[in-house]
Structures are given as structure tokens and as C-alpha cells.
Amino acid sequence: MWRSYKAETPELADETQEVDLNLHDSSESDHEGRQSRSASITSSTSAPASNDVTLQVPITNSSATSPTPSTGSMYFIAGMFDGKEKVNREQPPMPTTDGVEYPRAASWAAGNCANVLNDDKGKQLFRVFLFQSLAEENLAFLEAMEKLKKMKISDEKVAYAKEILETYQGSINLSSSSMKSLRNAVASETLDMEEFAPAIKEVRRLLENDQFPRFRRSELYLEYLEELLPRSYAEKWAQSFEGLLGNHVGRHHFRIFLRSIHAEENLRFWEAVVEFRSSRHKANAMNNLGKVILSTYLAEGTTNEVFLPFGVRQVIERRIQDNQIDITLFDEAIKHVEQVLRNDPYVRFLQSSQYIDLLSKLK
């Protein structure tokens, strides 16, 4: 039976957060020295559905109509693909950990992008990540659109809309139809906000399906989490294999250890199946992801091959061929992989410098 892995939280049960383990991309460190063995499961059809996000953008008293967002306005450079301006980009400040406890920061990676965008410190950390990924214009565009919606004076609103178009049309990646709608909206004196909707939707989808998954697996986010992680959480991993897998930081350090003993593909497979199960309400996404998992981890001779008992892989292959794909497709395979990880690598990890050194750093 598949287990539900939860992150360690304070003793209050109602504060427990489900850990979202969707596997969309790996962090840069995950690829170091292991590019031939790491696999990234990405699929636009398997990505979580985009939800509307209410961006909490501070409203300034200034009458200026610059589309540069008030939060972080000193470092956003319009036309970021211009060489001179790109060199002059100034990194936004990292958010401090003051007033932030581990469960709050861990919740930023759960669910969808709204969780991080609706938290001031989470959004600032996400902003830093986007800056490092040369993609901060996407968040800045959404913030500018939120400010536009809140403006009341029509003349200022029209002028601001024109500046938004001038600022972002060369840097955000929009389809031709959405860009046309954006230009039509700006050209109209009535400023029908429905004309802006396609562009807003596409940028939100890009954040949700591409940049947010990268963020929650990034070194930047994991290091921030590790700074907040109480030692008591990490100590519990010695008694709970499930607790280790259900914790972002714990799973990250376990992955590094598994890489050192050439067994990382087992955890990658486990994470991919978690994502597969999370797509159970999207038939096409589940079908596509099931086939990707089969070819990436279970095909004979693949670099990331996970070895299963005789017959288990054949059953999976047959079910996929017969289009009998459901949430139980990988159940037997996961039981075996969990047992493999628990029997030897988990025990060795608890005795490793990777775990001991982490404990020594935590308070």
C-alpha cells in the first residue's frame, strides 16, 4: 500500500503539511558529476493546472506610471536581452529568515505557485531565483498588470498600459495571439482588461509549469530551508524512513548520498511515481508520464535503469500497451524500490558524513 509522506512539523497535528514531491526538474547540484545518470521528468501535460494568483503588490503613493514594480524596482532591467543592460542587472536582496519557521517555508513548495507568491518572503526568494534564472521579467509583468488593474484615473491607466507594452514586449515569451491581444488592449482607449487576460494566463502558466518546479528543487530554496530546519526534525529521520523521504531537506541530502553510491536512480524513480500519482485526475498527463517513467527508468539498458524482480516490469509494460493505466500502475515496483532503499542505503546514510555533518550544523 502506498504511504502518504508528510513533512515534519511542530507537534500540533493540524500544522502538518503534505509534501508535494512533483518531479519536474533537478537542481544544478543534482546534475554535477552525474549528468549521464540523472533524469528529469518534464511534461507540459503533467504539470499542475494553473490557478489564478492574487499578487499582493504594494500600492505606492507616487503618481509615477512606470511599469517597474514597486517591490524590487531598483534591480529590474527592462529589455533584459540587451547586452549592456544585462550586465548592469542588480540582484534583488535575499529575504531574511527572521520571523519564518520551517513549516511556513516548506509550504511554499507544496501545491501550486500561489503558495509562494502569496507569502512576502516566499515571493522575494522566488524573485531571487527568477533573477538568477534570467526570468524575473515574468513576475515583474504580473505585478505590473496587478497595479494596472487597481489604477482608477483613466489617463494614467492608458499611459501605464503603454509603458507595460514597451517594457515587456521584448522580454516576455508570449504566443503571437496573446501578444496581438496585448497590443490591441493597449491601443484601445477603453483598456478592456479581458484583452490582457491571454498574456497574463500564459505568463502565469510559465511560472507554474516551468519556473516554480525548478525553484522548489533549487539549491537556493533548499539552502534557505536548511537554515530553518530544526535539529529535532533531522534527528527523527533516524527512526522514520518515511519522515526522511517526506522532508525536502532530508530527501535532498539522501539524494546526494545515493549519488555517491551510484543508487540515485531509485529515488528519482520514487519521486517520478509520486508525480505520476498526483496526476490521477488528468488522464492524458497520467498516460504520458507513465510512458516516460517506463522509458526512463524501467527500459532495459537505460542509464537510469531501476532493477525490479522478474515479471514486475513486464506487467507494467503490458498494462501500458493495453492502455490500462491508473494510479496503481507502479505499486509493485514502488514496494520493491522502497524496500531496497530502506534495507541498505537508508542504514548507511544514517551512518554517513552526509547526515552527521548536517546534524552538526543544525540547532
Curated annotation (Swiss-Prot):
Keywords: Phosphoprotein, Repeat, Signal transduction inhibitor. Residues 21-35 have a biased composition (Basic and acidic residues). Residues 1-70 are annotated as: Disordered. InterPro entries: RGS, RGS_sf, RGS_subdomain_2. Disruption phenotype: RNAi-mediated knockdown in ASH sensory neurons results in hypersensitivity to dilute quinine. The keyword ATP-binding does not apply. Gene3D superfamilies: Regulator of G-protein Signalling 4, domain 2 (1.10.167.10). May be phosphorylated and activated by egl-4. GO terms for biological process: chemosensory behavior; negative regulation of signal transduction; sensory perception of bitter taste. Residues 36-50, 58-70 have a biased composition (Low complexity). It holds the Pfam family RGS. Residues 112-225, 240-359 form the RGS domain. Modulates chemotaxis responses by regulating positively the sensitivity to CO2 levels in BAG neurons and by regulating negatively the sensitivity to quinine in ASH sensory neurons. PANTHER family: DOUBLE HIT, ISOFORM B, REGULATOR OF G PROTEIN SIGNALING. This is Regulator of G-protein signaling rgs-3. It comes from Caenorhabditis elegans. The gene is rgs-3.
